[in-house]
Regions:
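Surface-exposed, charge/polar-rich loops and edge strands
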Residues: 1-210
């Protein structure tokens, strides 16, 4: 939510005037997102469940743009990337409830969902969700996610990221590191520190492009 603070009504109006499609997502941020990573290995850090809501119009816009998006904030990232794995679960053809679509912390990395994902494009995953809404007469998807995005994660939907500067030993910094494929985040943060950028929720922002 805090990355969006940089988008004033004037900025949003200019984006709309340029013909850029934009949508809003809902994710109820869990405390685990901000809990410092104290474990020696990331496998020892537990993410809390976060509840999400995505409207039909957002899914239709994603399909229009081949399931590619610029995310504003790490909250949007977790929502969009979780959508992909929810769509992967629907590829099975089984009749699932919205609760069944919950994305567990390590599902993108290992197990049957990760194996199925190898054969499901982001576009197909979003189409699966839209078809699910059609079958059940729903206008929005309500589900949950425990996803953790860390180095080694393969981004599916998010192609660019607008985000603030995060504190050390945080899952948010892990997410940024994964987005930039490892090393480049050090250079960005060194530059920010040497030029007195402001960090955290009310600080400066960045546009990250892998």
């Amino acid at each position: 939510p805090t990355a969006g603070l940089h988008f004033t009504p004037e900025v949003l109006a200019s984006i709309d005037a340029a013909g850029v499609d934009r949508e809003e997502l809902t994710l109820h941020v869990g405390a685990g997102t901000f809990k410092p990573v104290k474990a020696d290995e990331i496998q020892g850090h537990e993410m809390h469940t976060e509840y999400i809501c995505v409207h039909r119009e957002t899914l239709e816009k994603l399909i229009k743009h081949n399931a590619e998006a610029i995310a504003v904030g790490t909250t949007s990232v977790r929502t969009l990337e979780s959508l992909y794995y929810m769509g992967v679960k629907l590829e099975s053809g089984l009749e699932l409830t919205e609760a069944d679509l919950h994305v567990c912390q390590w599902e993108p990395y290992e197990g049957p969902v990760a194996a199925t994902a190898a054969n499901v494009t982001p576009l197909k995953a979003i189409q699966n969700i839209l078809a699910y809404l059609d079958r059940h007469g729903l206008n929005s998807l309500h589900s949950s996610t425990q996803i953790i995005i860390a180095p080694g994660y393969n981004y599916k939907i998010v192609k660019m990221l607008v985000t603030n500067f995060h504190q050390p030993q945080s899952t948010l910094l892990l997410l940024v590191s994964a987005f930039l494929h490892g090393g480049d985040w050090h250079k960005i943060y060194d530059y920010a520190l040497s030029h007195d950028f402001r960090f955290l929720s009310y600080g400066d922002s960045s546009l990250l492009i892998p």
